[in-house]
Amino acid sequence: MTLPLPVDLSGRSLLRVGDLVPAEVEAILDLAGELKHDLTPRLAGRTLGLVFMQPSTRTRLSFSAAMAQLGGMPISLRSDELQLSRGESIGDTARVLSRYVDVAAIRTLSHDDLETWAEAATIPVINALTQAEHPCQALADALTIRDRLGGLDGVRIGWVGDGTNVLVSLAGLAALTGMRVVAACPSGYEPPPGTPVELVRDPREAADRADVLVTDIWTSLGTDEEAAQRLRDLEPYRVDGALLATAAPGAVVLHCLPAHPGEEITAEVLYGPRSAVWDEAENRLHVQKALLALLLG
């Protein structure tokens, strides 16, 4: 039997965490937990279009598996397989895509381009990562924290390193769910103004008594030319055993992956007993199943 949907998100897009209200976040996480075990083909006959302007491992695989587990069909396309690469506009591509599929997940560095996709499309559009935000990752992080710690309200998150799009989305979600984020970022690597974090410079301040310790890759999408300088600037912000020891007893470690062990995180921590990284990666699948089910009603 198909489970009733807890909120009505039918027909909506998800471009930023701020598109959601607290009750909707809770409903997505609750449904994601249920869909870990319920494989009812509720989206049989529906189609997901995946458009990736940048490489992807987890996002492409998890969205494809999510749609398949719900009984639907995923179709994945790279930018070089589309007429976009030969000058067709995003708007026209979105209008055509809307005639063939029921929902689209788009990965593109430019958030403005994502908004153009959503404005032209007549189907729900999901942000599968832009330089501005990564809302699906934030939802997976929240599900992982809730699974590990039993709840979200009052949880202290320590972020260490570059103030990336992942931090922006995680901080936005924390503000909706009663969590607090303390972010240690070097000068020049802060998140955008208005991001709801307590900003510090010393990584030990972020890690101190944190229930969750989070980091991200130092050389992310669009930053390869700056790699050498970034490695020098971020060297003091590595998550290692000594830093983890200052966190709360039972604290867990998150990383959205891919990871570079020895740079932003040591292998000891990444593969250690307090790492929830692999559960976090799996939970991308489950929160995206919930999103697809809710957006398609």
Over which residues does each language-model region extend?
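Glycine-rich phosphate/diphosphate-binding loop of Rossmann-like nucleotide-binding domains
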Residues: 53-65, 147-216
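Rossmann-like adenosine-cofactor binding region
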Residues: 194-268
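Phosphate-coordination loops involved in phosphoryl transfer and adenosine-cofactor binding
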Residues: 42-48, 153-155, 250
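Adenosine-phosphate binding glycine-rich loop
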Residues: 250-251, 256-297
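Positively charged, low-complexity intrinsically disordered leader regions
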Residues: 1-61, 65
